[in-house]
Each structure stands twice: as structure tokens, then as C-alpha cells.
Amino acid sequence: MLTLRSSSDTVRGFPATKRDMIRQPSAEDLDAAHQLVSSARGVADLRPDSFDASRSPDGDKASVDTGAAMDDTASSDQNHSESQQQQQQQQQQHSQASEQVSAPESSSRSRASPKASRNTEVFLGHQCVPTNRIRDSGANANSGYANSSTSDPRASPAASDASAQNASGCGSTPAGTCPGGGSCNGTGGAVGCDGCPAYNNRVYKAAPRAPSARQARASPSAQTSEEQAQSGLDALDSASQDASGMPKACQNCGTTLTPLWRRDDQGNTICNACGLYYRLHGSHRPVAMKKTVIKRRKRVVPALRDRSPGAGSSDNSSVSPELHSASLATSNADTNAYPPSENGGPSYGAAQFPHSAPPPIDFTGYYSKPTQSTSSPGLNTLINHSPNTKKRTHSESTSAESAPPATRIQSDISASAHLPPINPASARALPNSGRLSSISSLLNHTDPSFTESHVDAALGSNAPARSQTQTQPQPGTRSYSPNPVNPPTTQPAHGSHSIPPPPLTPAADDKVKAARRAQLQREAENMREALRAKERELASLK
């Protein structure tokens, strides 16, 4: 039989070395310490029923068994040194059996100690965030204990739903009355108020914000560092806010609505308007200039901005309908870009409506096609053989001067065909007129009736001296009619224009020159008369 002695008598009977061995932590103490650290890290929740279980009679009985085993070992060491090894083996077997029974109770007793309760208070104190909400430590609970299957009231579905609603409600801001479109009153509510500094300074920074899920799942060490950073931010916010929790007002005008806070030379907080006024004028802005609505640049809201604070009041925003329709078209295009898969989600395979490039078009011969003309063949021949618009060289000008008069007349006609008409109304009334203008008709008329009716009396003796080449119409030329309503007639070309006329004798050449001189004088007089008629017509229209 084993005799039971008190633990104090057992300790007194041991030598000093054995007392030190007894004071060393045992396996139970180490296990209890490990469980305490695990609970402090959020692995398991502390419950009051564990404290009650530690004071049960079973726990007292287990402690008596452990003390009896220790007394048995001490008596065997004192009485029989020969049978010490045998008793140690028995003690080891007995201690192993007692450890299996008393391990949960000893751990419960160690957790119920005052030191454990102090650690529990510190742990619970760390779980409280600045928003006075207790952090749910059961989010990452992967307990390895048998009693961890019991549910915690804080982790119930109703409580979790309430916490989710609280988190979503704290971050949301009430709908404001900002008109938008560059007029800002700092309350928000328009589509462009999401990134407005005045709105953020006044409303958004003062709104309560709940901790995010990432912060709730952080480790204790990371939580400690985040709490320190949050405390620093809270200190800065409290320094820039008054007792009501809103940002401080301007020291000069008292406004709380500004896109940018400034400081004067004394370090006082002033608004943006007062700061700019002080910088430009060197004096503080008068209070009478304070306005409740500030003018800002009109914000261009992206097409897919559907999560802004003012998304619900988009009817009062200043965004054009074209932008709204473009955003709807973009969202519809993104929705229909991929066909739905079998499981209901979008299939990221081949797109249902692939974006194809426009068909290629060859513009190589666009500018090289010849222009088709509806004029007469003789006129086309003259225009095609006419010189270009560039300045002529010396050889070309010399050859033009030495050419026969008929050739020069034809070149004059072809050159004058590119001039704009003087009278657009008469030019439009001429059918099949091509590009010939009234100037060319005035300068190159060959109508005998017109010549006889407009011949000067002083030059009448020289009129019969005209050569046959002047009286006969040139091939491909137009005859002039004094009445602008009657169109000039085109004489048909009987021969090829590439064959030059035969050379003239000197006497005939002098006659041609004299006739040409008289013709030019008559044409100049006719042009003066036509100009006077047009001036009279313009005067009558005034």
C-alpha cells in the first residue's frame, strides 16, 4: 500500500538538488503554457465553463493521484537503494497512466490561474479596435481540442450578419445635395463627387469606417503594428478636427468647405481661397467674399463609374446623355463579348462577336483617273494641247511669238478657258459651255454682224482689209453673241489641229498685223462698254 503524505513534508525530506528538480516545469506545465499561448493567438476561445470544470472533484482526485505517485517515488529512494530501479519503473508506468487522466484538468487549472486571467484580459484588450467593436477572434479558429466544437455567441449567424451590416453601414455616406457640374457645396451626391477634395475633406473623412476583413484576419503581431499605425492616423485626424469630429474651419473666414487646406505665415489653418488671396494681395481675404458654393472645374466622369457615392442621384448630375448611352453601350458590349458557359459563368474562349478590321480599300488610282469632260471634241483637243500653268521657258515664249497668228489665237482661247467667268448667271445659262468664260468670248469673237455693228468710224477703211483667215472662223473656236441669253455656237473642226497653216507672205503679214491691231482696239472698247454696263447694273441693285 502507498502512504499519502503532504507535499510540504515531501519537499522538506528531499535534498537541495532534488528540490531544484521538483521546482523545474514539468510536461503538464509546458503543455498548459503552450495552450495558453495558442489561445492568445486566437486558436481557441476562453469560456467560463472551463474554469468551472477545473474546480470539479475529478480534478481534485487527479491531483491526489499525482501527489501519491510523487510520494511513492520519494519513499522508494530513501528506504531501498537496491530496489530503486524497480520502483522507478513502476513509478514511470503509474505516472504515464495518471498523466493521461489528469492532463486536461491540469491544463484547465493552469488556465484558471491569476496569471492566465491577466493574460486573457490583455488578449481581450488587444482585440478591441478604435471603433469600440470587439474583434471576432473565432474567424480563424481551427481548434484541436474536443471542447472547441461548442459554438460561441459572438460567432453566431445573426451576430455575423449584424456585424456585416454594421461594417457596410459605417463605410457608406448619406446622399448629399451637391448640384455637380462645377458647383460644389461639399455634401456630395453627384456623379463627380467621388474624387472631389472638398467632399472628401468635409464628409468622407468624418464618416465612421469599420475595419476591413483583411485587418480582422491579421495575426497579433501584424495587428499590433496596424493598431500603432491607426493610432498615429487617429492622432493626426484629431489634430486636424474639432470636438464635433469634423475638419477644422478656416481661421480667416470660418468655412469648412475647401478643396485644399493652407496655412498662413503664423501657421493658422486657412482655406484655399483665403490662402490664394493672401498670396496675391498680401492681406487676408474679407469675410464678405465668403461663398457657400465654390466653383470648380467640371469633372469628366468615366463611362463605367457606377459605384460612386452619387450613383443613386445620377438624374441630377451634369453628365450628358451621350455619355450615359455610351456607358450603357460599353457595358452591353462587355456583357455580350463572351457567351455563357455550361455552369452559368462567362466562357473566356472565342468571343461571340469578334472585332474585325474594316475591309481594305485600294486608293492607288484614286487621283490618277482622268477627268471626263462633256465638252466638244475640238475644245478637248485645245485644252489637252494647251501649256501647263507653270512659267514658260525662254524657248517656249520665243516659239509662241514666232508662231502664226492663228496658232496664237488658239493658244489664247485654250489659256482663257481656265479663267473664271465674269457673269456667273450668264455662264450658268449657257448649255455645253465647258470651261470657256465670257472673257474668252469677248476677246475672240468672230461674228461678222457683231464686227460690222461695233466698227469705229475712224477704222472703217481698214475693215475690208482683213484677211480671209480672220473672217473665216477658226476650227474649234466659239462665235460671240452680244446677247448673253443666246449661247455662242461652236464651229465644227474639219481638219486636224496638229497641222500648222502655210506660211504667209510679208505683205499679207502686214495686213494681218494691222487687222489684228484694229481688232484688239475694238475688243478693248467692247470690254469697256461691257464693264460700264455691269457697273450700271450694280448701281441699280444697291
UniProtKB/Swiss-Prot annotation:
Region described as Disordered: 1-172, 210-248, 289-408, 461-525
Induction annotation: Expression is repressed by the transcription factor hapX during iron starvation.
Xref: InterPro entries: Transcription_factor_GATA, Znf_GATA, Znf_NHR/GATA
Annotated Polar residues bias: 1-10, 311-320, 369-387, 464-483
Subcellular localization, as worded in the UniProt entry: Nucleus
Domain of life: Eukaryota
GATA-type zinc-finger residues: 250-274
Region described as Cystein-rich region (CRR): spans on this chain: 178-196
Biased composition, class Low complexity, residue ranges: 75-117, 148-168, 210-223, 396-407
Transmembrane annotation, as ranges: none
Coiled coil: 510-542
Function: GATA-type transcription repressor that regulates iron acquisition genes through specific binding the GATA sequence elements of target promoters. SreA targets include genes encoding a number of key iron-regulated factors such as the siderophore biosynthesis genes. Is dispensable for growth on keratin substrates.
PANTHER family per UniProt: IRON-SENSING TRANSCRIPTIONAL REPRESSOR-RELATED (PTHR10071:SF335), TRANSCRIPTION FACTOR GATA FAMILY MEMBER (PTHR10071)
Stated name of the protein: GATA-type transcription factor sreA
